[in-house]
Regions:
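Conserved catalytic cysteine-centered active-site region
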Residues: 1-4, 13-53, 62, 85-111, ...
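Glycine-/small-residue-rich "gating" segment that lines the acyl/pantetheine channel
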Residues: 4-11, 52, 56, 74-129, ...
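Conserved small-residue
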Residues: 27, 47, 54, 83, ...
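Stable alpha-helical structural segments in soluble proteins, enriched in small hydrophobic residues
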Residues: 50, 163-171, 202, 234
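Acyl-CoA/ACP chain-elongation machinery
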Residues: 62-108, 141-155, 183-192, 209-259
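Condensing-enzyme catalytic core mediating Claisen C-C bond formation in acyl metabolism
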Residues: 94-171, 180, 294
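Short beta-strand-to-turn element immediately C-terminal to the catalytic PLP-Schiff-base lysine
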Residues: 119-123, 169, 191, 200, ...
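Flexible, low-complexity linker/loop segments at domain and module junctions
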Residues: 171-177, 208, 256-294
Length: 294
């Protein structure tokens, strides 16, 4: 019976249910790609890590292009209960649209979301040769794990600082060159505090003048998909020269003295930006995204 099911190709539906790598496998099968279909899980840093793997493979000459996909569909009663037991979710959800309050003094947790994002990452020469519209350039990546706690960041912020610093070094840019930071910005009391520490350490006296915003305030936290989704936000910020706001920022936190682009989108000159993704388990990925060079 098993052989008959395989012969009839009816096994695919079951395969997709129990194989964690099935998303990458199905995409490879659909598009006929020849590179290795890799699925990875580094919690909320997964999407950023996928982009990093693509960048490194292209730099090594192993690939001309890669399809980087971040996707998550974790909203379920069990997941809500588990995150609630961690005190990670916002409980102030009336009205629901005001529940996510990254960087605000009255923040109390994140809002779960489902979503997906996809980026075609390829060498600039390849993109130009086929006449592709180039939204931006992945200029550098940095990653660092702090191995401190399953759900908490190390209070010294060293891994976050190292992640951002490595990304800047990889992109051959100084902190002064960065025009915008797309924050991980979950809205949990501890995460936002640690990200603020990292940004202020890396950017020094200029940190207060670097716009930093969290699109999670508008769309919620897409978990494993967040790195790719937020890289897309960052690319569009560069393409349109417009910064997405951090909405629901009605009670500023004196302990986070940053320009969080409160409540209203803003036109701005953006040549170079950083996108941060920090995951449970201590995985941290930062990506530097730049405008296409002339």
């Amino acid at each position: 019976m098993r052989c008959c099911a395989l012969r009839a190709r009816s096994f695919a539906a079951y395969h997709r249910r129990f194989m964690s790598a099935s998303v990458a496998d199905r995409l490879a099968d659909t598009f006929g790609t020849k590179g290795s279909p890799i699925s990875l899980q580094t919690a909320c840093a997964s999407g950023g890590a996928a982009i990093q793997l693509a960048l490194e493979a292209i730099r090594r000459g192993e690939a001309e292009a890669a399809l980087c996909v971040g996707t998550d569909g974790s909203v379920s009663p069990e997941a809500v209960v588990r995150f609630s037991l961690l005190s990670a979710l916002s409980t102030r959800n009336e009205p629901p649209a005001g529940a996510a309050r990254p960087f605000a003094k009255d923040r109390d947790g994140f809002v779960m979301a489902e979503g997906a994002g996809a980026l075609v990452v390829e060498s600039l020469a390849s993109a130009r040769a086929r006449g592709a519209r180039v939204l931006g350039v992945i200029a550098g990546c940095g990653e660092k794990a702090d191995s401190f706690h399953l759900t908490r960041s190390s209070p010294d912020g060293k891994a976050i600082i190292a992640s951002i610093s490595q990304a800047l070094s990889d992109a051959a840019l100084e902190p002064d060159a960065i025009d915008y930071v797309n924050a991980h910005g979950t809205g949990t009391p501890e995460n936002d505090k640690m990200e603020c520490l990292g940004v202020m350490t890396v950017f020094g006296a200029r940190a207060r003048d670097v716009p930093i915003s969290s699109n999670k305030s508008m769309i919620g936290h897409t978990l494993s998909a967040a790195g790719v989704v937020e890289a897309a936000f960052t690319l569009l910020s560069i393409a349109h020269q417009r910064l997405p706001p951090t909405i629901n920022h009605n009670v500023p936190d004196p302990a986070i003295p940053l320009d969080v682009v409160p409540n209203v989108a803003r036109d701005a000159r953006v040549r170079h930006a950083v996108s941060n993704s920090f995951g449970f388990g201590g995985q941290n990925v930062s990506i530097v995204i730049s405008a296409e060079p002339a």
